[in-house]
A protein has these predicted regions:
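Short, membrane-interfacial amphipathic segments enriched in basic
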Residues: 1-12
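Hydrophobic alpha-helical transmembrane segments of multi-pass inner-membrane transport and secretion
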Residues: 22-49, 285-320, 343-352, 398-402
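Mechanotransmission and gating elements of multispan inner-membrane complexes involved in transport
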Residues: 70, 182-184, 190, 195-291, ...
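Beta-strand-rich non-transmembrane domains
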Residues: 137, 144, 161-177, 197-213
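Transmembrane alpha-helical interface segments in multi-pass membrane proteins
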Residues: 311-313, 319-365, 391, 407
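Short helix-loop junctions at transmembrane helix boundaries
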Residues: 351-394, 405, 409-413
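Short cytosolic juxtamembrane segments of multi-pass membrane proteins
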Residues: 410-423
């Protein structure tokens, strides 16, 4: 170290300056360290949870969802015959229109979509509301009428099972797969018989063949899978009746363009997975902006701390600066001394922040939790992307360099004659 300083007098001078103000130097380093730690932890936590949600969403929902959109209610009968507001008319018992949710020619559309080389899988779907009864327990939920083999191609149903076997639905016509939360509410397990009642009042005896846990809280707490034919029976519909077509793509990033293409081609509403979850992605954007603002504020405050320390050193070391200039040191040399000091504070605080941020993220990621939000997580999901560490360290260096630049310029402009005369 001493040999290095002997060869590099500017480094030695900067070193002496920093250690002449140990307390202030340590406080400035701690400010940088804290900012970098918060940057790494918050970025890792937010992106970890967001990536986990996106992964779950991509694997458990359709990349493109085709359905018959329910249109707005028809105008009131009065408006057809009376177009002024100066009369009072009472109409009773106007019959509501029975909206047709069926996707007509669904099988033909599925056949055409299957031929699209961009498509990995396509499956019919029939969704309905129902009541689940098991003993004295009763829960409302949703029923997904599916072709279980096709559904597994899209959403890997078998991988999400925590008990039972989905293939039993092929040999057991009255089989049902319950979401884990729904099964817990009912107190039902594999092998139990439950009663399912539709909004039409049709009741079916079903046998639980499997329990599914996707990690998507709403699905696990309310959804059950049954065969497409049983769903049609519950709604008293024919074997061709479906309400939705779900599509899984080979490249999920093409979902928006393909959804628009299918909507134009087949005449039904087609929604890509990002549009379906637009509200959640909006929350993500707000979170990211908030955290970015907080992190920048912390690093800016630490930068002001470095600025104040260097300005204090400059005014205290004015005679030293005058002597250095009298010895032949140029303005650029004086500037370099104070820039070295700011970089030393920034790099040391940054490296300590990287270490503390990594340790904090590791420890927090190991704490067992049971969070039930959009998704269910047992532990906080932390993203250890190396780019976060590089960005945090780079930002620390930039902020401290900027903080040291102005004091360095001021020190370089001092006139040694004026300094000595004022003393």
């Amino acid at each position: 170290m001493n040999s290095l300083f002997s060869k590099r007098p500017l480094l030695r001078i900067a070193w002496v300056h920093l250690f002449s103000k140990k307390r202030q130097t340590i406080v400035a380093m701690l400010g940088v360290m804290f900012g970098v730690t918060v940057f790494i932890f918050q970025a890792g936590l937010l992106t970890g949870l967001q990536n986990y949600f996106i992964e779950k969403t991509v694997n458990t929902t359709a990349h493109v969802h085709i359905y018959n959109e329910v249109r707005t209610a028809r105008p009131h009968v009065v408006t057809r015959y009376i177009d002024t507001a100066d009369r009072w008319v009472v109409v009773r018992n106007q019959k509501p229109r029975d909206e047709e949710r069926k996707v007509k020619n669904g099988n033909q559309i599925i056949g055409l979509i299957e031929k699209d080389p961009r498509v990995e899988g396509v499956a019919p779907f029939l969704g309905l509301q129902g009541i689940f009864r098991f003993g004295m327990s009763q829960q409302a939920g949703t029923l997904a009428g599916v072709d279980i083999i096709r559904e597994n191609t899209l959403f890997k149903v078998q991988e999400n099972l925590i008990d039972g076997d989905m293939l039993r639905m092929e040999t057991m016509p009255n089989g049902i797969i319950l979401g884990s939360g729904l099964a817990d509410k009912l107190g039902a397990s594999v092998g139990n018989s439950i009663i399912v009642i539709s909004s039409k009042g049709v009741a079916l005896d079903m046998k639980v063949i499997a329990i599914s846990k996707t990690g998507i809280t709403l699905q696990d707490n309310t959804r059950a899978y049954i065969s497409l034919r049983n769903a049609q029976r519950l709604l008293q519909q024919s074997g061709s009746y479906i309400t939705d077509i779900n599509v899984r793509l080979r490249d999920v990033n093409q979902a928006q363009a393909i959804a628009q293409e299918y909507q134009s081609k087949y005449g039904y509403r087609a929604e890509d997975w990002k549009a379906a979850n637009a509200n959640v992605f909006g929350i993500f954007r707000i979170q990211n902006l908030t955290v970015t603002f907080v992190i920048i504020s912390i690093l800016v405050v630490s930068g002001f701390g470095i600025f104040n320390i260097l300005m204090t050193i400059i005014y205290e070391k004015m005679p030293d600066i005058a002597i250095l200039k009298a010895m032949g040191y140029r303005d650029a040399d004086i500037s370099r001394i104070f820039l070295i000091e700011s970089l030393a504070i920034g790099s040391t605080g940054g490296l300590l922040g990287l270490l503390l941020g990594f340790i904090t993220s590791k420890i927090v990621g190991m704490v067992p939790l049971n969070i039930q939000g959009f998704v269910s997580v047992q532990y906080l999901i932390i993203n250890f992307n190396p780019l976060f560490y590089l960005a945090a360290f780079a930002f620390a260096l930039v902020s401290t360099t900027v903080a040291g630049y102005f004091p360095a310029r001021k020190a370089a402009r001092f006139d040694p004659v004026e300094i000595i005369r004022s003393r």
